[in-house]
Amino acid sequence: MLSYRHSFHAGNHADVLKHIVLSLCVDAYKEKDKPFLYLDTHSGAGRYLLQSEHAEKTGEYHSGIERIWLQESLPAELSSYFSVLKHYNYSGNLKYYPGSPLIAKQIIGEPYKLHLTELHMRLIPSCRCRRNAVCR
């Protein structure tokens, strides 16, 4: 059994850094006139409730995504990343933190093809319900 559960750490400073880099990479690939495939070897649940028991137990998102969310202005380079956050938190309140597959899907747009893998068996059903996703 795997002991790591990302729901305790979603939206922390390392997650934010990883997802900013991901959004910049996807933006760069989209500039090319060639197709590309998104492969995620640790896709996780896809979306995390920041007010969940797990997230509140560690509170790591308070020093990560919450600090960015509360900023009045951000560098233009973060526009793709922040637009994804706004998409999943359309009420204006920070409630959800999207994982890598949802960030990539939102930035890539249609048509997209995702190949997602996850070792936690209980997270695989959330992976399979994503349209155009191949899950293993």
Q: Which positions does each model-derived feature cover?
A:
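Class I SAM-dependent methyltransferase Rossmann-like catalytic core
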Residues: 1-33, 49-63
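Class I S-adenosyl-L-methionine-dependent methyltransferase module
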Residues: 36-37, 45-136
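Acidic active-site catalytic centers that drive phospho-/nucleotidyl reactions
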Residues: 18, 40, 118
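Gly/serine-rich nucleotide phosphate-binding loop at the start of the catalytic core
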Residues: 32-40
